Amino acid sequence: MEDKVNLAEKLALLAAPFQPGIVGRLNDHKLAVVKVQGRFVWHAHDDTDDFFLVLSGRLTIQLRDRDIELSPGELFVVPRGVEHCPKGEGAEVLLIEPEGTPNTGDAGGERTEPERWI
């Protein structure tokens, strides 16, 4: 059996925004926390949905046709294949996605982060 996880302590270990840290595993999915500061990159995940649960701050999930505004305790699931761009000012977010899913989806590039446990 694993130990309990304190998300506030794990978030404190993150030095920079948009660098997710894995905090747990659920079947073949990773649970990760990330800090969101500014705007990320437009991207899509062709093979999986993208789950965002706001822990603190405010997060906007930009879609091509609308913006989804999220406050603490609110979540949104971006359907697979849908282009989106997260942005926020100091938001802290829990992500759930299949292991091996790159944070930048199909966009790739310099903002792609390796999977790492914290």
Which residue stretches match the model-derived regions?
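Double-stranded beta-helix
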Residues: 3-11, 24, 89-118
